[in-house]
């Protein structure tokens, strides 16, 4: 799964990864792009294919580097136009489609989150309380060994001078997250 395909991995990072890993050209690669949860979508697609008897072994996961998302130039709105618009593709639509945005808006996922919170009356305090509780539940599950069978440890090179780093767990959850710490974070939008 990959959200914002750009760079040297081209548009089909799954195929590139399979070939560069030494898989024969007869092994297909399929990149899933559903924006949020692309990696999880790839895992679900693989599980579904195994369940349906379409194969016995699938390699699935997610890759993303939003910091490398490109700035892009939209097409001119009229012939010989000199008013090129540049779009930051890190968050939001790469090339806004006016028909779509006029009907549905052009909100990014964080903006949509704020809109939903406003619509349902979810305060910042309630959101931070939920987020802190979610982090605490993850930490308790991790300490109980709940995730031990779900992540296969891998070694990642750190260059010639350092030994490989062993990756054994998800990097995002933060054991130190508290309501107080979260409430000090500046909101992205007002």
What positions do the PLM features span?
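A broad detector of the eukaryotic-type serine/threonine protein kinase catalytic domain
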Residues: 3, 114-122, 187
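Flexible glycine-/small-residue-enriched beta->alpha junction loops
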Residues: 57-115
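Short glycine-rich anion-binding loops that position phosphate/pyrophosphate groups of nucleotides
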Residues: 3-5, 63-66, 159
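Conserved catalytic cysteine-centered active-site region
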Residues: 2-58, 90-92, 103-109, 176-190
């Amino acid at each position: 799964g990959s959200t914002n395909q750009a760079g040297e991995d081209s548009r089909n990072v799954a195929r590139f990864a399979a070939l560069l890993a030494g898989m024969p050209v007869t092994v297909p690669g399929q990149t899933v792009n559903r924006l949020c949860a692309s990696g999880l979508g790839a895992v679900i697609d693989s599980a579904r294919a195994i369940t349906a008897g379409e194969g016995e072994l699938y390699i699935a996961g997610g890759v993303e580097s939003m910091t490398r998302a490109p700035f892009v130039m939209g097409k001119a709105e009229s012939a010989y136009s000199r008013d090129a618009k540049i779009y930051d593709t890190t968050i939001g639509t790469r090339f806004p489609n006016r028909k779509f945005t006029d009907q549905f808006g052009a909100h990014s996922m964080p903006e949509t989150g704020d809109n939903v919170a406003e619509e349902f009356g979810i305060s910042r305090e309630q959101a931070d309380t939920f987020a802190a509780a979610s982090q605490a539940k993850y930490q308790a599950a991790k300490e109980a060994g709940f995730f031990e069978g779900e992540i296969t440890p891998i070694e990642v090179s750190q260059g010639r001078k350092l030994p490989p780093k062993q990756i054994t767990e998800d990097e995002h959850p933060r054991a130190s997250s508290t309501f107080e710490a979260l409430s000090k974070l500046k909101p992205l939008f007002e």
